Amino acid sequence: MVNSNFYRNLGPRKLMAIADFLQDFIEAPKIHEDVAIHDIKILQEASSNDISFLSNIKYSRFLKNTKAAACIVPKDFTGEVNPNTVLLRAENSYFAYGKLIDFFYAPVKSYPAKIMKSAYVAESATIGKNCYVGHNAVIEDNVVIGDDSIIEAGSFIGTGVVIGRNARIESNVSINYSVIGDDVVILSGAKIGQDGFGFSTEKGMHHKIFHTGIVKIGNNVEIGANTTIDRGSLQDTIIEDLCRIDNLVQIGHSVKIGKGSIIVAQAGIAGSSVIGKYCALGGQVGVAGHLYIGDGAQVAAQGGVAQNIEAGKIVGGSPAVPIMDWHRQSIIMKQLINKRSK
């Protein structure tokens, strides 16, 4: 059951209305009994008034005994199903489920077009139409924020920063030396645009190198909680359109991340490395500095990238090697350990 303290249930929704709403994403059988659907639940918990979904085949065993009135399933699903459950077949069942969530629920919390009294907004700052600025937020000189944007409580937007339309900057975010596009989401605690880790050692002293670059973030980007993105040292740090960056990711100075790439939690990318378009870095991946990862390449979780990776390659391990080599290494290592233990 969705907690009503945080989300409003917009139901009940008729099953036929759900099928109509999802018609661009699903194939639905003829619905003879237009039952009222009250909620979305997992297969194990769904009742005869609920709808469910299946995107991971590991859970298909629950379809046999589920009580759900309907279930969104992959288009080619052929497993055993409760005969009372209507199947809505989707090319991408997880995507269809996401659309269904939007049809059923809305956040309780709203953001009126308002600047809270405890917020500080510099006179030279430009705030667009229908924006919300939360308690104790700070917006410094010459900041520009586009229409329909949200700046939540305690966030700091430094001098000269530009943020596009329909941005959502959650609580306690710090943004400096940055130009940010439209439809960007930055989750709580993220730090954008601070100095990178640049020092020169001379006569036993570590001398800080002043960073003159900025951070450029494209359109429709999401940046996770407590992620840190350093501004460029001389060349800018660039996050292109459609990127998704998870929580607790570190992106070093002058890194470039190509369009549509995904970086999972606790990954770290050292300075001046370039990640191509639509790449995927798994959790805890480390990328050394000044490397190039080609378009569409993937690095398995905890991979350590110490050399360039060609476009489309899949690698794993530390140091990272082609994924099949990594699997072979793992098997051989296990065999050696078992042999020594006998």
UniProtKB/Swiss-Prot annotation:
GO terms for cellular component: membrane. It holds the Pfam family Hexapep. It catalyses: a UDP-3-O-[(3R)-3-hydroxyacyl]-alpha-D-glucosamine + a (3R)-hydroxyacyl-[ACP] = a UDP-2-N,3-O-bis[(3R)-3-hydroxyacyl]-alpha-D-glucosamine + holo-[ACP] + H(+). One of its GO terms (molecular function) is N-acyltransferase activity. It is an enzyme of class 2 (transferase). Belongs to the transferase hexapeptide repeat family. LpxD subfamily. Catalyzes the N-acylation of UDP-3-O-acylglucosamine using 3-hydroxyacyl-ACP as the acyl donor. Is involved in the biosynthesis of lipid A, a phosphorylated glycolipid that anchors the lipopolysaccharide to the outer membrane of the cell. This is UDP-3-O-acylglucosamine N-acyltransferase. It comes from Rickettsia bellii (strain RML369-C).
